[in-house]
Amino acid sequence: MGYDPRPIGVFDSGLGGLTGFQKLRALLPGEDLIYFGDTGRVPYGTRGRDIITKYARQDASFLMGFGIKLLFIACNTACYAALDTLAQELPVPVCGVIEDASRRACAQTHNGRIAVLATAATVSGHVYSDFLKSLRPDLCVLEQPCRLFVPVVEAGRFSKEDPIVRILTQEYLAPVRAFGADTIILGCTHYPLLAPAIAQEAPEAALIDSGAEAAVHVASILAEKGLSNLPDHKGGVRYYVSDSVEDFTGSASIFLQHPLEGPVERIDIEKF
């Protein structure tokens, strides 16, 4: 069996991808991980597909400069806009977050009614409903845009007791309750931090974390393709952002639920 010491690259529009990154770190402690959060251009979910694809290409180009062995797009919006493009253009495996969450939701639902909470861009592309129905044509799928969830979470507000969070979750979950979904896909990697608030509004529904499901798939790909690092290697982590290092450092520990393990550096993503 071969081993591959090259790092894994992970990117998101901002901080949200750290939820999937954390799961990946827990599953693969022997892998070197490089995270890029495009904090200077967050959110992606309110932008057009061409702009999102441009940003995703720049993010991928930056990470490819480290000689990565796999690219993990820990951003639902970027997956909707650019995953297929990057998979065709890059010489390494490219993993997203949509398909694995969809498969888990199909297995989870009992009444065949699945709701997807996502950014406006992801909803507009209908990538979740299309893929879910390709797996199970009998499903009823509601795609609910949650335009303000990402800015609120990036601002550090996600407590279920926060009045702004309560107003937003009540508004966005009302159609979900009326729809009768028994399974909700958190179709943005920022949303797991809002899980307690979402569960408060939809207590009967199972919540599917798209980033966590995808991280499990990434681990399986490494094993299948012989890309795992040496078994005795202790993996390291590095973080890069396109805006304030201080703001990222202050908020990242909330997403990771522990202090940052590696250095953080600001880069000019427009150069890539």
Language model features by range: what are they?
Residues 1-272:
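Non-catalytic structural scaffold of enzyme domains
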